UniProtKB/Swiss-Prot annotation:
Protein name, UniProt field: Snake venom serine protease Afaacytin alpha/beta/beta' chains
UniProt domain Peptidase S1: residue ranges: 1-27
Record-listed E.C. numbers: 3.4.21.-
Organism field: Cerastes cerastes (Horned desert viper)
Activity regulation information from UniProt: Inhibited by diisopropylfluorophosphate (DFP), benzamidine, heparin and hirudin, but not by plasmatic thrombin inhibitors, antithrombin-III and ecotin.
Tissue: Expressed by the venom gland.
Length: 27
């Protein structure tokens, strides 16, 4: 479960970074 949680956190961080990058490029 812990390993899965770590993967989930890494995925979430990637999505956040991607979203932030998209917002920056959008502006």
């Amino acid at each position: 479960v812990i390993g899965g949680a770590e993967c989930n956190i890494n995925e979430h961080r990637s999505l956040v970074l991607l979203y932030x990058s998209s917002s920056x490029f959008g502006e």
